[in-house]
Amino acid sequence: MAPAKKREKDSNPDGSAANGIIGLTHGAPDASNAGSTVPPTAEGQVKLNGHQQEQELFLQAFEKPTQIYRYLRNRHETNPIFLNRTLSYMKERMSRNNKKRISFQVNSMLESITQKSEAVSQNYLHVIYDSLHEKLPARLDNESGEDLLQEQLLCEAGESVSVETTLYKITRSKRKDSTLDFQELLSKCSQIVYNPKDRVGEHATISIPLQTMRPMGEQHTLYKLLFRIKVLSPSTCNDENAETPPNKRSRPNEKMFGSELILYEKSSGFITEGEYEAMLQPLNSTSIKSFSPKKCTWETMPDSYIPLSLTYDVYQQSPMLKFHLTLSNEQLPEMISAPELQRYVQHLDAVAEMNYNNNNYNNNNNCSGLKNGSGGGNSTVCKTTPEHIQIVYNFMYSNNTRQQTEYTQELNCPWCGLDCLRLYALLKHLKLCHARFNFTYQPAGSGARIDVTINDAYDGSYAGSPYDLAGPSGSSFARTCGPVRRTSVTSLMVCRPRRQKTCLDEFLELDEDEISNQRSYITGHNRLYHHTETCLPVHPKELDIDSEGESDPLWLRQKTIQMIDEFSDVNEGEKELMKLWNLHVMRHGFVGDCQLPIACEMFLDAKGTEIVRKNLYRNFILHMCSLFDYGLIAAETVYKTVQKLQGLLSKYAAGQELMQRQREEQLKYWLDVGMHKKQEDPKTLKSPQKPAPPADQASTSSASTSGSGSGSSSMQPPKRMPAHLKRGSAASSPGVQSKGTENGTNGSNSSSSNSKNVAKKSADQPLSTLANTRERRSEYGQKRNVSGSRLAATPASKRKLSSKDNTVLNKRQRYSDGSPGTGIGNGHGGGSGSGANRNKSNNHSLPATSNNASSSSSNSKRAIARRRSTSERTKASGSTGGGAGGVRTRLSVPAKYERR
């Protein structure tokens, strides 16, 4: 057994004075223990301690659920989760019926609104006084009792009393506001009868224009009606001059009573028409100042003030002022007769049916609506009378009764104080709303006994949405946060069986099936998810974002962009491309090299247009080449990606113009500033005063000094230039060509040095002086003498070729020279030999210098010789037929070696 909780106990040994449960009375103590004066024995002391421990365990078991339900009661009163009148077993609490739904028509909506507007659009608010009533206390037999009775009454019955009615306007002031907080709008005095013996013949009226109670826009304005009654002591009440203000000596005999009524408030609107009773309370001379919040003090409250919460029959102990409130278009006279009052009262009954403002009751008014008042309206009071049954609660623990309440006829719930009006509704409420206990109904004669035990099978876990508990404290069940997203329910199974008739037999025994077969009717993921990285709960508004895909939150993207901007060793274009690429990889979470091809494709789909627009075309191509160099993507991927980017560029006209403009700017930069800037001759820079020698002198001097300087020239290779420039320079130097033809039999050293010097000097000549080398390729392939006959090219003029080109040239030379079976060299030996030499010189020899002294006749002779050799070769090939070796075919050779 668990140890008993230490409590402060009284001298009563059975613990009957311990704290009770829910404020109910304890059972009677044991009479034998209470009446025994002899000290108990050891066995009796042990039994007594065991009983106290069981009592402590009983109190501990019932204490926690009771505190929980007490807290839920307070919360449900201020912020209810549901309305009890909507429950099927609480039909008696539903004061409204749905009979009007049968005869409801859409066309009637306009009529009802019109009637409502007509009823509200009145011009005057009338206060019709009835009388002033005060309950007479029980009379005493002696004379002192008569005197005490006269002192307690305001005045003698049937006397007239003056009532001062004042209308005040209270405005919530702000800083630097010129309007008054407290303003008096209207004040009138009327005569009413105090405790009339017979029926009142005339009634005093006050008409208040509604124009004086206009709301001031959004400013909080309150209109309050104050009733004050001044009466004198009985010694001066019958005086003829009672209405005049008393002198200073009689002022202590003056009494003042007052009450207030709120006519208009911004939150509730105008007060409802009806019959009212205002409870009057004693006031002193400074009570009127209590209306101002700045002047409100505790001293203004009278000593005889009785709060409403302390006295139940406070309306019976204070004077009551009866009056009517009506609305009409006409102003009433100051006094009306009783028959006219009945006519206005009937008007109130007719207007009450069209009144829809049912919630204008204000607890600040010390008034109680009796007929068509604030508690009335079109609501219908339930006609069912509450049951009168003697009910007792029996609290049991360990199958033993530990505490029992007194018999009561109230059908209120002991934990939440709800008036259930019927025994069946009470038992149903206890079973469904207080599931921490088990309730068993036992008939007991004309009453009922309800056994209360602890529900050990109660699941204390939260059965609602787990997201309510994950939110901030205080906002889980808040109703002021507005509409928020909630978790979606996969499927909702609704079972609405046929309702059976209510019977108390269902509470006789516990339902074992309901305890064992408890299951949720809501299916789906009724659980709480958490973020992977932060382990924080995922709120319903974050369910669309996958927790695993949170690799690029906003703060991380901003931090990445900031870090890239801080780089100093890359240009702006590379920075922009790095931002786009890094954010793209972070967003999609590419983790492997095999995903890079699809990453490049997705990158172009998402950022292709932006790449062209930001002029990042070359940066992206360089990035693709870098990926290829590191082996991350294949060449096919590079080709497809660039081709796709070209396709995007072809459809983007603005991008094409931008690329063209940027290309022109880049070329201009290269030619003006970059590596392709035109540089001057270094020799000219060394000796700017010495003029450059002519081309023929330079070539002559270089040819004469080539023999002596061959060793130095071999150590310093000449400046290499394209072949077409070398051939063009050779054609544009006539002096050098003539000297080369006359000295054709010189050594190889002199000829090679001569050609090098000519190539060097010809590079500086303008392109306009260069001849077309295609026409001279075959003509100047061999050197010619003065007579115009062709000479074999010198070995020094041959160009070094690769092995592949040499193989092709050898095959062609073999076919052109007349290999075995061709028959070309038999009949035309000289022609074939010269043709072979010509083919060799035309294909793999450098162009020799042409003789500038040859005339036009020599040119025509060379053309005739070419045609003659061509015709002879054609005849020879045609005469040799039949043999396989005699068939001559033309092999495909590279274009640069092909004969022009």
From Swiss-Prot:
Region listing for VEFS-box, in residue ranges: 527-603
Positions bearing Phosphoserine: S547
Originating species: Drosophila melanogaster
Zn finger (C2H2-type) location: 411-434
GO molecular function list: chromatin DNA binding; DNA binding; zinc ion binding
Entry function: Polycomb group (PcG) protein. While PcG proteins are generally required to maintain the transcriptionally repressive state of homeotic genes throughout development, this protein is specifically required during the first 6 hours of embryogenesis to establish the repressed state. Component of the Esc/E(z) complex, which methylates 'Lys-9' (H3K9me) and 'Lys-27' (H3K27me) of histone H3, leading to transcriptional repression of the affected target gene.
Residue stretches of biased makeup (Low complexity): 698-714, 738-757, 850-862
Cross-referenced PANTHER family: POLYCOMB GROUP PROTEIN, POLYCOMB PROTEIN SUZ12
GO biological-process terms attached to the record: facultative heterochromatin formation; negative regulation of DNA-templated transcription; negative regulation of response to gamma radiation; neurogenesis
SUBUNIT field: Component of the polycomb repressive complex 2 (PRC2, also known as the Esc/E(Z) complex), composed of Caf1-55, esc, E(z), Su(z)12, and possibly pho. PRC2 associates with the accessory components Jarid2 and jing to form the PRC2 Jarid2-jing variant (PRC2.2). PRC2 may also associate with Pcl and HDAC1/Rpd3 during early embryogenesis. This complex is distinct from the PRC1 complex, which contains many other PcG proteins like Pc, Ph, Psc, Su(z)2. The two complexes however cooperate and interact together during the first 3 hours of development to establish PcG silencing.
Principal location: nucleus
Keywords: Chromatin regulator, Chromosome, Developmental protein, Metal-binding, Nucleus, Phosphoprotein, Repressor, Transcription, Transcription regulation, Zinc, Zinc-finger
Region annotated Disordered, chain positions: 1-44, 678-900
Feature: compositional bias, Basic and acidic residues: 1-12, 773-782
Family: Belongs to the VEFS (VRN2-EMF2-FIS2-SU(Z)12) family.
Protein's UniProt name: Polycomb protein Su(z)12
InterPro entries: Polycomb_protein_VEFS-Box
A GO cellular-component term linked to this record: histone methyltransferase complex
Localisation: Nucleus; Chromosome
Biased composition (Gly residues): 820-834
